[in-house]
């Protein structure tokens, strides 16, 4: 039987180590794929499938892509959930003895992409590492493209919702997890259904304490706890170590770039559940999942890629420290009030490249000459940028300016080394600047002027020897030689070495000519190799300034965000909110920031809001569909959130007492795939709100109780309002509650702090006009038929509906719902739970309970409860 060819043996040996990846195998100017990889790649990338003789009786399936444009193909495979192993030729084919050596230089995965062509400029690309143990978790979110990691630890009786909340905060494209996470179906189901990310299970052996310590020491040194903020006995060290080992396995080099570790506490930021993030459309719309129509779209006037990513981060993570918020607001206010300086600052920011990602590509050795020269051009702009920030006469901006390192040494090194017209690749040379390295200049001179160099040497040798007819020639056998006719042989110096005798004379070589020959014949190859080496040395030199460049990049990004927020505030007539630790949410003439921009050219009707935890705890809002209730409630939530990221807000005045969380239940969305109806989804979301909200939270609820019978729905809505708004029964937090149950308006007066509001409607005959104005008091009608008419129902249908309505109103003495005596409900209360049962429940260790033990325990509880009720 035929054997595999040597090259195919090499391929299969490498493939054996990377069974789960598509192997890009470099052959000349192409990356080739074979066997199953070729079948997959040809299908996913629409490549022509061919075959290659590999020594077997059949041809191996094969397809390929040009090496100079491979990134686009890799990006498409990554987007489809594949990993790609890049196998390069690691020796010069011209010098190889036999088969060219090849090796894996990196494995590209969704969370480890660093190529600018494969990344979104305005979005971080996080890889998450989660270590779960019981009711605690260590989490690490790293952006390999910027070299920054965020770490935290969570402890909860129910850990899954907390972990999911952090996943939603960072939106990782890849998640590493320990085997214990497989038992947490809530997290794994959420990852599968909602996160659209790759998941990698890390073997339990990788978490051995000894291996963890080695990984952390190798990356951060022996004093890693002090450098990173990780506790020596904390769970996050396991998550970080697993991430570092994964990066070492996939990236081969450059992992040292991951040096900036930011320890955070979830309590530093406003809590935003996944549902709230979606309902408020912070960074993507619910329907099209696009940027236009989101809060990010409105606020993004940033000039740099770094600023765009930071703005997104601020929106995803509003602050809860009033002092930190007001520092941001003061900087924004200073820029709002200084129009000229703001304009000059923004102009300077437009010239700043993406220092964060350029730095990473330099460390990983994948930066192009043009990118590095762009870094130098950015450094040239830093003095003007810093001076502009300092001129704003604002302590916060001056402090940021002080963090901008001018990076003179980096700029000087790059400008000295890189040619201003350097190409995008090293392939053809032309990268190193003239005068930077004498050998480069000499090799270029030889390559570009071989005839001239030989003529100069020939003239000099004639002068030195006195032989007027001395000539320099060349043939393929002897290479370059010096030819002297017989009549001048006696004048040839002793240092000349005779190589060939002719009838007419002699041919010689000299050491100088031999060296020149080597230079001429190998000038281009040696020039390319030398430029590669010098460029690599420059990248290493730049990489040594990692901390300085990272610090500068962060300062520039923050300046950019502050300038953008100021520009938006000035253009859209926003005001500075008063932010403190009170319980107030008072807004005068508030507007919805997004709807206002979408309605450019139309008048947006502003509305006032007054909420607190005493006299105005819960606003019950009634009125017809399409009148603007949801818009009004969302705008209040968005204004509070905008204030807490440090932004001015769309209002004439605003007072925001810091809220620790925003919870929303807006709209209906059946989860049929998971077997959940609209009502089930609604109740699940409301349950989460009731469990997690605090008196410092802002709750927005829209149409609670739909999807079930009228009595059931109304009863649930009533109970929810009581629990949320009445401190004696539950939370007493600030709440906006929209409802079609007009009976709930009776709660004003019976529960302190509950107030009725409605959307003003103007009616003429059977036609209505929505005035979009929020006014005190309950709505006088639901206007359901009128809304149906506006929605386009045929006139015959709406007229018939009016007839039926009049008949029902005439025949029915009183709707049963209207006869409900809610006050009578106060007399009823739930039966007391026996203290014995409570003691058993409190002593129960849910984490260690087996299914059989759980059933037995439930049986005993039922017996106890039955006996108690009978007694």
Located regions from the model:
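Charged catalytic and DNA/RNA-contacting regions of genome-maintenance
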Residues: 1-334, 350, 354-363, 367-459, ...
């Amino acid at each position: 039987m035929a054997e595999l060819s040597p090259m195919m043996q090499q391929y299969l040996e490498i493939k054996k180590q990377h069974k789960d990846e598509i192997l890009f195998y470099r052959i000349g100017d192409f990356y080739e794929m074979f066997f199953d990889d070729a079948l997959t790649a040809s299908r996913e990338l629409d490549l022509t499938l061919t075959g290659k003789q590999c020594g077997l009786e059949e041809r191996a399936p094969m397809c390929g892509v040009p090496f100079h444009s491979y990134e686009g193909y890799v990006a498409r495979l990554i987007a489809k959930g594949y990993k790609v192993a890049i196998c390069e030729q690691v020796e010069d084919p011209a010098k190889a003895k036999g088969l060219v050596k090849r090796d894996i230089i990196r494995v590209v995965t969704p969370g480890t992409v660093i190529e600018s062509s494969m990344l979104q400029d305005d979005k971080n690309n996080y890889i998450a590492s989660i270590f779960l143990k019981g009711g605690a978790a260590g989490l690490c979110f790293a952006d390999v493209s910027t070299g920054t990691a965020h770490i935290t630890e969570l402890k909860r009786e129910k850990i899954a919702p907390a972990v999911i909340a952090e996943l939603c905060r960072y939106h990782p494209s890849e998640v590493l997890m320990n085997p214990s996470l497989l038992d947490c179906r809530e997290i794994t189901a959420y990852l599968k259904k909602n996160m659209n990310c790759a998941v990698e299970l890390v073997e339990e052996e990788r978490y051995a304490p000894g291996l963890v310590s080695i990984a952390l020491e190798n990356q951060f040194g022996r004093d890693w706890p002090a450098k990173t903020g990780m506790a020596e006995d904390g769970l996050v060290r396991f998550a970080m170590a697993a991430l570092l080992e994964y990066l070492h396995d996939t990236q081969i080099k450059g992992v040292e770039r991951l040096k900036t570790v930011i320890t955070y506490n979830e309590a530093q930021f406003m809590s935003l559940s996944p549902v709230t993030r979606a309902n408020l459309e912070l960074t993507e719309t619910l329907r099209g999942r696009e940027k236009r129509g989101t809060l990010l779209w409105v606020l993004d006037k940033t000039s740099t890629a770094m600023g765009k990513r930071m703005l997104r981060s601020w929106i995803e993570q509003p602050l809860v420290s009033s002092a930190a918020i007001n520092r941001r607001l003061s900087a924004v206010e200073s820029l709002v009030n200084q129009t000229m300086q703001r304009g000059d600052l923004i102009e300077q920011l437009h010239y700043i490249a993406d220092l964060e990602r350029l730095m990473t590509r330099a460390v990983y050795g994948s930066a192009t000459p043009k990118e590095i020269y762009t870094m130098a051009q950015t450094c040239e702009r830093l003095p003007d940028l810093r001076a502009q920030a300092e001129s704003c006469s604002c302590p916060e901006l001056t402090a940021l300016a002080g963090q901008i390192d001018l990076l003179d040494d980096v700029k000087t090194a790059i400008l000295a080394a890189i040619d201003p017209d350097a190409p995008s690749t090293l392939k053809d040379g032309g990268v190193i600047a003239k005068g930077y390295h004498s050998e480069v200049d000499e090799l270029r001179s030889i390559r570009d002027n071989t005839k001239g160099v030989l003529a100069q040497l020939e003239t000099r040798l004639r002068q030195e020897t006195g032989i007027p007819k001395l000539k320099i020639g060349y043939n393929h056998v002897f290479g370059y030689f010096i030819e002297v006719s017989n009549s001048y042989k006696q004048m040839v110096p002793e240092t000349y070495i005779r190589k060939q005798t002719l009838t007419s004379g002699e041919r010689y070589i000299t050491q100088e000519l031999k060296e020149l020959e080597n230079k001429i014949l190998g000038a281009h190859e040696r020039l390319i190799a030398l430029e590669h080496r010098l460029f690599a040395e420059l990248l290493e030199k730049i990489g040594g300034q990692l901390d300085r460049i990272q610090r500068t990049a962060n300062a520039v990004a923050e300046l950019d965000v502050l300038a953008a927020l100021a520009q938006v505030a000035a253009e859209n007539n926003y005001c500075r909110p008063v932010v403190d630790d009170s319980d107030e949410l008072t807004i005068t003439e508030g507007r919805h920031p997004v709807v206002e921009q979408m309605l450019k050219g139309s008048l947006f009707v502003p509305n006032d809001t007054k909420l607190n935890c005493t006299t105005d705890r819960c606003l019950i809002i009634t009125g017809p569909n399409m009148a603007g209730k949801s818009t009004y409630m969302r705008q209040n939530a968005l204004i509070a959130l905008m204030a807490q990221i440090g932004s001015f807000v769309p209002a004439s005045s605003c007072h925001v007492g810091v809220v620790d969380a925003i919870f929303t239940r807006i709209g209906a969305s059946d989860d049929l795939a998971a077997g959940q109806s609209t009502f089930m989804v609604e109740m699940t979301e409301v349950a989460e709100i009731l469990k997690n909200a605090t008196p410092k939270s802002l709750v927005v609820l829209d149409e609670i109780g739909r999807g079930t019978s009228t009595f059931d729905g109304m009863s649930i809505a009533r109970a929810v309002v009581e629990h949320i708004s009445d401190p004696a029964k539950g939370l007493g937090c600030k709440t906006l509650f929209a409802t079609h149950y007009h009976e709930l308006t009776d709660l004003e007066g019976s529960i302190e702090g509950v107030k009725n509001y409605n959307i003003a409607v103007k009616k003429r005959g059977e036609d209505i006009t929505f005035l979009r104005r929020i006014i005190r008091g309950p709505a006088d009608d639901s206007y359901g038929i009128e809304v149906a008419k506006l929605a386009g129902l045929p006139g015959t249908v709406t007229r018939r509906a009016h007839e039926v309505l009049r008949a029902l109103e005439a025949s029915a003495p009183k709707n049963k719902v209207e006869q409900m005596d809610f006050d009578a409900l106060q007399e009823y209360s739930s039966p007391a739970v026996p203290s014995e049962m409570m003691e058993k429940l409190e002593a129960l260790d849910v984490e260690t309970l087996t299914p059989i033990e759980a059933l037995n325990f439930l049986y005993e509880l039922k017996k106890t409860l039955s006996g108690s009720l009978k007694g």
